[in-house]
Amino acid sequence: MIGIEATRANKPGKTGVEWYAWHIIQELKTLTAGDGNSWILYSNKPLTGGLEKLPENWYEVRLKWPLPYGWTQIPFSYELHRHKIDVLWMPGSTLPRIFPAKTVVTVHDIGFHRLPHLYKKRQVHIHERAMKEIAKKAARVISVSEFSGREISEAYGINSNKIAIAYNGIDHGTYKQIKDGDAVEERLRRYRVNQPFFLAIGRQEAKKNIAMLVKAFTQFKVRRGVGDPFKLVLMGPQGFGYEDIKREIANSSVKSDILELGYVPEVDKPYIISAAHALIHPAFYEGFGIPPIEAMACGTPVISSNAASLPEIMGDAALYFSPEEPEQLIGMMDRLIQEPNLRTTLSTAGLEMAKRYTWKSAAEKILPVLTRWA
């Protein structure tokens, strides 16, 4: 009997880890239908968004809880104590208070450990405590890149033999080249986006280095002079450190050319990505970095920070700059405007690179880690 914590996957308005959990669960359903094991999805609310469609050997356990916190440590722990299971998979970096000996945890990155000043102090404390617990008690850890696996091993003394690598995937049914120009134009009108533009996707927070991007874009525009048509579009909800981003935008001499879209539903994102001159991903730290791969799948060139796992994930299919060097980024933006052949080359290379990353292949790597003890 294998249990999966599904509260993240069951959230509306999903971002990173929530989409990761949702996609892996959906792929595991297909891979394990009738496999002889019983699979249980634990959640605090009725399963929705496709999660509720369960194969015969899959079950839902709903544990109601009135508070926005404490579900993992109280009702979920109590359920695991009352009804024993063989294996538990936690898709996010946390453990319940009570859990089976064979518990597997996915750790996406440890940016909070390497760059704590980019996180809320309380979040750093919570994550550090959780990671120490995981290091001591988890049977296996799943990492989303070789880089992240090494980081986890070195920082918390976890034997590398306990760490399994399963690269993230992307939804190729959603993120793909869009040939329907009218549909693209309709989305651009809806979000009031004018071409040409550079695009950044992700939570608008300190660790994503958006303030530096705004500063670089401002310098880029000033140098190109009056009448330059390029815009900067920021897509994603606000996060920790947004005040600095807001201040940088307010102080920019080209703030009228900077558009904040906030959260954009998955169904609309590919249309905006496809229309972008390039995606810029300036993050200080990433365990994997899904938005650049989604952009590549849409045929959009990528300019990325060379930090952490990003060169491992994208190889030679992107242009790279140091996240501390806005001048390097400005140079890359200029190159993609002045060298159309380079843009075509990156688009072609990106399309091929994106094919490597599927949720099915990720689930196929995770499945044997979960079933070896079942």
Predicted regions span which residues?
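Carbohydrate transferase catalytic cores enriched for Leloir-type hexosyltransferases
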Residues: 1-374
